[in-house]
Amino acid sequence: MKISSSIFPIISIFILLSISSVTPSDSDDSDDFDDFFQCLPKQSDSSIPITDAILTPNNSSFQYIYQLRANNLRTFLSATSRPVAIITARHPSHAQAAVICAKRHDFQLRIRSGGHDYEGLSYTSDVPFVILDMFNLNSIDIDMSTETAWVQAGATTGELYYRIAEKSNVHGFPSGVCTTLGIGGHFSGGGYGFLIRKYGLSIDNVIDAQLIDANGRILNRKSMGEDVFWAIRGGGTTSFGIILSWRIKLVRVPPRVTVFTVQRTLEQGATELAYRWQQVAPKLPKDLFIRLQPEPINNGGNNKTVRVSFIGHFLGQADGLLRLMNVSFPELGLTRNDCLQMSWVESTLYWAGFSNGSSIDVLLDRVAVNKVFAKEKSDYYKAVIPKQGLETLWQVLMDIENIFVQMNPYGGRMEEISDLETAFAHRAGNLFKVLYGIQWSESEGGVNATARYVELSRRLYNAMAPYASSNPREAFINYRDLDIGSNESDETDFEDAKEYGAKYFRNNFIRLADVKAKIDPKNFFKNEQSIPPLPSH
């Protein structure tokens, strides 16, 4: 859904009234608010007035826009404060002005593109803050002569897939399964999907970028330098600046691909198959990706069991897939009836959970419809989970029920790229990455049940500790998890940051902190899990 510009009325004449509703009683603070709002028009392009893009709490559209892209109700409804303003940037100069004026008047800036941060750090803070909403900066400019595209930060993965398909049926791009992810944040943490084994991460196919630094300058790859370009690919861009756009290299895909889902319960041998999957999936040819997804179900009456789904994507036709599976993973028993052949863009709908035959127009729906209360955690596995460990996993799933697990194989292209190539350090040596999630609804307790469900997510995470990576126990930054370490909203202690930094970035953390010290030495861009400047020696 594209938000009409008509819902953003000119508010310049109402600025002072809006300020009064959020301004502390202290007169100096009042001056800061007033000065901040007066600063914005002076620092932006007057031909596209930024006043049209500013929302304050007294504006009728403020609450709607604030919650529209706040996708985790757990973080949104438990927030102790709301932004003093939302700047719905429609021009790069609006984003530049937000940086310059927030820095000048001591407001924290939170940057939101799709609003899928699992801990809500793109739209919440415990200190006075402004949201810079990139949603309207969503242009996608594809050049088929060079097989490249410039994609603005506010575009979604679904829009990107749709625009590629408009130009070609033999091109695609390796990024997320969810089609409402904002490109700005998704790529900055790495960006992965079902093409990961063939083409690596999204960032492995990024060739340039436009970044606004803490001084409000727009930098490209050449002007930012290779160190910064290295850091923003996998290091979490919001520690270094604001991504305006990425230049990507499109990848080749066949005209027809094959997808499948095979499901087996514990009674049908799912444990043996899951054990075998760990040995096979990371070593399959690059063209084949098979996700393992276990879930608890009722097997008649009150009998609980676990059903394991093997969800596959093959860059080729069904006959070739069947020949490959009969050699590499015959135990799964894949048949021709299990296979669906379709175009690559249609396969993005399959992975996103749309029904077979859905129009690709659904890729243009930009906002997640179903918002839930959720808590997510992640793991990397470097060794096969023994059957005893799988049985532990099954038991916890049956005990908790609301938990979901996704296990995504590595290998292939991920095995070939050095940990040092980009800031993303989880490469060779990993068999698979795991997402653990728990979701609940308002009827199941809503925000008041947060403590209970978060504790349940930790129970599963702790149960799998003996089998996951260790020293450090690695985690994926795009599955943000404050449990693994955090700072206060307005502080970034280096020693505290090392705790989560080592888990997200392994040995790349120190280099990231060094880059941070060069591009943002005063630490303007920060959040509870940002990268601090490396202390001087």
Regions found by a protein language model. Give the residues of each.
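Soluble FAD-dependent oxygen oxidases
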Residues: 2-537
